[in-house]
């Protein structure tokens, strides 16, 4: 119990630090977004407006992540036997979905402007984009100091980094408009921004989806874990082996282990738990250890396709 208490205290300290970094980044993003919307309208720049729209999703992602971190920090109670730890996963799913929707809107408007390009104020675009690069660098630096293994933090980080790249593309587009008068550079830059959004969304949805579908954590092979359990000299049979992730950095395992008649089930269970924690980093285990019937062959069985990539 002491180890779990220390672990919970460390999580509380880390969570508070993460919330502070997120709050600072949120303040920067909201302040600059308000300025950028005004400049985008005056300059008639879709690239700037798409950046501002992306910053709106950044702000939403940061706010959602703050709420998710607060909820995830709540202790288990009542029917919520694991607490609300998966709030961070739902936050990542929402962030990924928002990126997909926004990318679609931007591409639609960009195509319309490619067909009939309006005039663009190149100077306003370049200056605002350079300021946006500076703001996003600071916000990225803040979030880089937070715990990016947390899916809520990682979702916000991906939003900010994508926005940083978008501002770089917008600055280049503005410079092209200034030098060549090629107004279509602005919507073309917007399509590039949308592509970055979709790439970031794919990563978020895939990682968070694996957790929601209770796939084995990345880097852990179920067959290897089952083999490690079966290697124990007193183990006769391993089945119903399941490995999943309750939340980011919270792997769990359950299995039914049969040992030879006369062996100490409790001692073997403790040895297996220690091995799983030291070798695979799994400290939340539920092992049912019983005696095997005579002459039962060694086998490892689990849910089909447990190692299939998601």
Regions found by a protein language model. Give the residues of each.
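Residue-level marker of regulatory loop/turn positions in helix-turn-helix DNA-binding domains and
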Residues: 16-20, 41
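First transmembrane helix
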Residues: 22-38, 135-138
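Residue-level recognition of phosphate/Mg2+-coordinating polar/acidic sites
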Residues: 57
